[in-house]
Design a protein with these regions (language model features):
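Conserved Nudix-box catalytic region and its N-terminal flanking loop in Nudix hydrolases
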Residues: 46-89
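Nucleotide phosphate-binding site architecture
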Residues: 5, 12, 27, 53, ...
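Unchanged
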Residues: 73-96, 100-158, 162, 167-168, ...
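Conserved hydrophobic "DFG−1" position in protein kinase catalytic cores
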Residues: 45-46, 54, 118, 136
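Acidic, metal-coordinating catalytic segment for phosphate/diphosphate chemistry
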Residues: 1-43
Length: 186
């Protein structure tokens, strides 16, 4: 950031009084501009027969790989609204959003991923502009080796374990940077 979005004056990077981190501070109006983690919000859309809806990505990062419908939360929406919107945008699928199921903290890329359980309302779905294809998968059919992001893989593994136990439990994971695949964005 070079200029203040409030007044247009230059900003400088320094530690504000009574703070402990560098922040962008306007040199004229003294507004402190905080850069906080981005929220990635999505759904685990399940059809009544237990299959899960996945999207094959048409965009980078991880073009051509499979994922749950998810994306950046927008201002002015709740996390549940964001999960439903992303499912509609990426898979043209309508869902009833349920409970928050997983949270993954990824401090190395300044992101927090939130995934909700969701019920597909019908089988009228198709690829959105960010998806090459969308499909329903049983646990055994999921393309585990071509899942785009670690939070998606961990969430699906946990989801199927919980489903076998007959009860679902929220889980929270702090993910460190991957050491084996530096191109893995999460």
């Amino acid at each position: 950031m070079k200029f203040c979005p409030e007044c247009g004056a230059p900003v400088e990077l320094r530690v504000p009084q009574d703070d402990h981190r560098e922040r962008h501070i306007c040199t004229v109006c003294t507004t402190i501009h905080y850069h906080n983690p981005k929220l990635i919000v999505g759904a685990i859309p399940e059809w009544e027969d237990g299959r899960i809806l996945l999207c094959r990505r048409a965009i980078e990062p991880r073009h051509g790989l499979w994922t749950l419908p998810a994306g950046f939360m927008e201002n002015g929406e709740t996390t549940a609204e964001a999960a439903a919107r992303e499912t509609l945008e990426e898979a043209n699928a309508r869902v009833a959003i349920g409970d928050l199921y997983s949270m993954h903290n990824l401090p190395h890329i300044d992101q927090v991923h939130l995934l909700f359980r969701a019920k597909l309302l019908d089988l009228d779905f198709s690829p959105g502009v960010e998806s090459l294809e969308v499909a329903l998968f049983t646990e055994n059919e999921i393309p585990w080796d071509t899942l785009a992001f670690r939070p998606v893989k961990f969430t699906l593994q946990h989801y199927f374990e919980d489903r076998k136990k007959g009860s679902f439990h929220f889980f929270n994971v702090d993910l460190k940077p991957p050491v084996d695949k530096p191109d893995n964005h999460a």
